[in-house]
């Protein structure tokens, strides 16, 4: 179905500084985002275009053409001034791929077969559905340490658009999941999502990438303190940078992390077919280990490390499914790949809100899951600890050091993603809080998520030591 969003735009609108330079980025973003939200997540295309994309790239949508082909599972975004069109297409098991200077046939020629999750074995009593997190069943929850009515009221507020008026965007909250003492005690969905909807984590994907590095280290396939296995760095000033330094965002190889227009990170995500090559080609600016600089490219360098160790797109996919996802009963999660069959480890992870909570619970349980040590205690202790370069960042996740962001909770750790994605771990209260959505206004994100955390905390008492 082809829709002409608009046929004209005045010269005044096009005269903004740098606006024309942003058109290719905007088209790539829109094609990729619309493809992922329609075909990965099942959202309505008009909802995605009008409520999620337009706020991100306005006023550019007024000159664009958008074609969503449900039969081919493909999205094409063009403009009325040029013949250049951005195309993204869906593949079962690995989501949407943005085509830039490659064809769909090129991408589909890279060997890939999606796997099926393992069969659920019945319990001794014949039951086939275990209680969450080891299955999907849930029960009514009451606990003396929690005022459930107060907790529900606090969590419901982040779905209420009228509670946060005066900001530059809507909340667009898609999910909230709350876990207490390993039990799922609250979940609510919005924007057409439900408990089965794979939801984009954006930079929460970095935490998954960190876990995969930890798994490789646990299995003796990777040494964190040796030079990162990136052949492009041999015989250069970057050759001594270690995987541990990359995990801590302290490799010293920098890119501009700005999502508001044309920048290094938007070029990598929306104008480069080979994202790993772009990420590893950037120059060294600081001495490795000394300087913290948050970067999606750093996580993509880690994804390149994973790919170099394992060898292929299929091997990477099989590894994260079989070694991390399936053991946690994450049955339908995936991370998207670029047009060269390389995992986009900094931004493109999809899973249900319940599954994002499972990842948080894995770290809160020190890597233990249903009697199995999925990640070593040594790895978890390292990942959750401040680095030498930054006291508020560990191995691909954030740390509320000294209660800087949330007072009185120095043990709080969190995964964080663009547009307000969060998985929050609060060990002192035995809580996991997940929030997903499409909130463009940064100040609105911070206010609403802080209100959610404070409200949930007010409804709970500390866990027993």
Feature locations, PLM:
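Active-site SXXK
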Residues: 182, 199-225, 246, 302-306, ...
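Active-site Gly/Thr loop motif
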Residues: 330-337, 381-432
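Active-site-proximal alpha-helical segments within enzyme catalytic domains
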Residues: 210, 297-307, 347-369, 421-437
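Beta-lactamase-like hydrolase cores
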Residues: 137-177
């Amino acid at each position: 179905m082809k829709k002409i969003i608009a046929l004209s735009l005045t010269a005044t609108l096009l005269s903004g500084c740098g606006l024309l330079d942003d058109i290719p980025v905007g088209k790539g973003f829109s094609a990729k985002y619309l493809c992922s939200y329609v075909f990965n997540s099942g959202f309505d295309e008009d909802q995605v275009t009008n409520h999620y994309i337009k706020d991100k790239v306005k006023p550019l949508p007024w000159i664009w053409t958008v074609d969503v082909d449900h039969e081919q599972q493909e999205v094409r975004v063009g403009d009325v001034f040029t013949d250049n069109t951005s195309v993204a297409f869906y593949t079962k098991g690995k989501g949407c791929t943005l085509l830039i200077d490659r064809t769909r046939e090129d991408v589909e020629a890279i060997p890939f077969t999606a796997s099926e999750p393992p069969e659920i074995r019945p319990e001794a009593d014949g039951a086939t559905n275990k209680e969450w997190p080891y299955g999907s069943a849930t029960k009514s929850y009451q606990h003396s340490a929690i005022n459930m009515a107060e907790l529900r009221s606090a969590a419901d507020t982040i779905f209420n658009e009228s509670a946060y008026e005066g900001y530059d965007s809507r909340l667009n909250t898609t999910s909230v999941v709350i876990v207490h003492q390993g039990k799922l005690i609250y979940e609510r969905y919005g924007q057409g999502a439900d408990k089965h909807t794979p939801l984009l984590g954006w930079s929460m994907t970095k935490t998954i990438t960190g876990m995969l590095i930890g798994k490789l280290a646990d299995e003796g396939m990777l040494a964190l303190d040796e030079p990162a296995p990136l052949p492009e760095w041999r015989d250069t000033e970057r050759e001594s940078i270690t995987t541990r330094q990359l995990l801590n965002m302290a490799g010293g190889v920098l890119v501009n992390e700005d999502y508001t227009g044309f920048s290094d990170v938007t070029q990598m995500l929306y104008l480069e077919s080979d994202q790993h090559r772009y990420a590893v080609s950037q120059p060294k600016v600081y001495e490795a280990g000394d300087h913290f600089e948050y970067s999606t490219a750093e996580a993509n360098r880690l994804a390149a490390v994973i790919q170099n160790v394992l060898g292929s797109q299929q091997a990477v996919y099989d590894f994260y499914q079989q070694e991390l996802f399936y053991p946690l009963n994450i049955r339908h999660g995936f991370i998207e790949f670029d047009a060269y069959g390389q995992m986009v480890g900094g931004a493109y992870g999809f899973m249900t809100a319940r599954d994002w909570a499972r990842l948080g619970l894995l770290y809160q349980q020190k890597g233990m899951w249903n009697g199995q040590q999925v990640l070593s205690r040594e790895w978890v202790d390292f990942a959750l600890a401040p680095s030498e370069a930054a006291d508020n960042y560990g191995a691909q996740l954030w740390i509320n050091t000294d209660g800087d962001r949330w007072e009185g909770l120095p043990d709080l750790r969190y995964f964080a993603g663009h547009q307000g994605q969060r998985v929050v771990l609060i060990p002192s209260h035995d809580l996991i809080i997940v929030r997903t959505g499409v909130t463009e206004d940064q100040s609105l994100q911070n206010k609403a998520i802080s209100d959610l955390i404070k409200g949930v905390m007010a409804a709970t008492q500390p866990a027993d030591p």
